[in-house]
């Protein structure tokens, strides 16, 4: 890798791969870069909000199934718009899926990470670069408020709760009127 590709690789590792590894408990918070520690805050907040809204159960048994279903889900998420909030949802979703694979001991978490990495590289990174890159993502993370988080969680749930990939989406909070 050289030049521009190395820069892109570093951006994806900072934003996506670092958080997934932290989420799976493969690295500690102290091993995160200062930048990763900052974005971890908003991603953890997104995850907490999502966790309060719905329980997502995965059914993943093969690398091909992960690639196909992951791509279907995230393509649906971004089919009409890319924004920083949806990118946060994408990262949290990727981390949850990887952790599920690790916890299920099916040794497929690396497939999730590779699939998420490739999707971000080919589908999201050009938008991210043209919208300020890491600096703008961090600015979004630091200035995101509860309303934008809830809005993006609602959107995330509306896209995924009826998707065949998810076996169940239960425990919606009645007072949030999510979908």
Curated annotation (Swiss-Prot):
Cellular-component GO terms for this entry: host cell endoplasmic reticulum; host cell mitochondrion
Keyword entries, A-Z: Early protein, Host endoplasmic reticulum, Host mitochondrion, Host-virus interaction, Inhibition of host apoptosis by viral BCL2-like protein, Inhibition of host autophagy by virus, Late protein, Modulation of host cell apoptosis by virus
Keyword Aminoacyl-tRNA synthetase: no
Compartment annotation: Host mitochondrion; Host endoplasmic reticulum
First and last residue of the signal peptide: none
Residue ranges of the motif BH1: 76-95
Disulfide bond entries: none
Gene3D superfamilies, alphabetized: Blc2-like (1.10.437.10)
Molecular function terms, GO-annotated: BH domain binding
GO biological process per UniProt: regulation of apoptotic process; symbiont-mediated suppression of host apoptosis; symbiont-mediated suppression of host autophagy
Induction context: Expressed in the early phase of the viral replicative cycle. Expressed in the late phase of the viral replicative cycle.
PANTHER family named in the record: BCL-2 BCL-2 HOMOLOGY REGION 1-3 DOMAIN-CONTAINING PROTEIN, BCL-2 RELATED
Family: Belongs to the Bcl-2 family.
Known function: Suppresses apoptosis in host cell to promote the viral replication. Has the ability to potentially bind to all the members of the proapoptotic Bcl-2 family. Inhibits autophagy by interacting with host Beclin 1 (BECN1).
Protein name as annotated: Apoptosis regulator Bcl-2 homolog
């Amino acid at each position: 890798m050289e030049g521009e590709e190395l820069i892109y690789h570093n951006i994806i590792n900072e934003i996506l791969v670092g958080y997934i590894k932290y989420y799976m408990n493969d690295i500690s918070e102290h091993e995160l870069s200062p930048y990763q520690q900052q974005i971890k805050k908003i991603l953890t907040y997104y995850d907490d909000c999502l966790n309060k809204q719905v329980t997502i159960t995965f059914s993943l048994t093969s690398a091909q199934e992960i690639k196909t279903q992951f791509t279907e889900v995230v393509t649906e998420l971004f089919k009409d718009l890319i924004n920083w909030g949806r990118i946060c949802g994408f990262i949290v979703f990727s981390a949850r899926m990887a952790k599920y694979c690790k916890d299920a001991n099916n040794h497929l978490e690396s497939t999730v990470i590779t699939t998420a990495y490739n999707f971000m590289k080919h589908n999201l990174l050009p938008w991210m670069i043209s919208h300020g890159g890491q600096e703008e993502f961090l600015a979004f993370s630091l200035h995101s408020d509860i309303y934008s988080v809830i809005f993006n969680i609602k959107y995330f749930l509306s896209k995924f709760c009826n998707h065949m990939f998810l076996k169940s989406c239960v425990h919606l909070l009645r007072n949030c009127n999510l979908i």
